Amino acid sequence: MAAAHVILVSDSHLSASAPQAQANWDAVVSYVGASAPDLVIHLGDLSLDGARSAADLRHGRTQLDRLPAPWQAVPGNHDIGDNPWPGALVGSAVDAARHQRWLDIIGADHWPVTVGGWIVLAINAQLLGSGLAAEAAQWSWLEEQIGRHRGRRPVALITHKPVTATGSELAAAPPYRFWPPPARGRLARLFGGTPPALVMSGHVHQYRLLRLDGTDHLWVPTTWAVLPGHAQPLFGAKRCGIVSLTLTTGTPAQQELIEPDGLEQLTLTIDLPDPYHS
């Protein structure tokens, strides 16, 4: 089977009120037009505040539709709200209305796609631990998909939040950075002794490739702005950009960090104000 070229994009934080985010997005659109990928996947936080603003989410949809290539997307915490966790701000959690708004404006929040002989399973990580009916339905779907494809073709996962990290990183992390531990354990049990070949995530605004227990964990950087050192430790590379991914049957995934022409390297609180903690 021929190789498939996929562009991975994440954490764009788009809004009509965010010109810096828009300028960097324009650079992504131009790069996609020049590189002609088979698919573009957005890994969440498409919008600046879609969890509270339907206008931001609609703006994000308009920008996705500008891409001169087929696209798919999963929601992030700023699109539909976060996983419930102790100490979270009141009103920050995902709920049924926010979830439905994503479905109405953007489309499916979890989906399978076959590219380059691989099966890519996209998961709505924001539902995990929510107790919503949609969470149970997604787990049932995921179990069926894993059972169908595990051992038959390479399996890759798409999720906004990283599933895991090193033991020391997990121990030191705030509860909102990675998957909730119960969900992480349930995923491992579903895969059993045949883990996914690749897990792709965003959320952390850093580029990283980490191999753990037979799985490559690829962190896709932000197209908007990285976080300063006092707000987040360094895990990989704090660079704004996208990832070019090549998938071929029988070959490990090939990936490369891309910094498109015109995409500015920005740091939150230094180069632009923090809209979430002002």
What does each model-found stretch correspond to?
Residues 1-59, 63:
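N-terminal active-site segment of His-dependent metallophosphoesterases
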Residues 19, 132-134, 229, 262-272:
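A short, polar/proline- and glycine-enriched secondary-structure boundary/capping micro-motif
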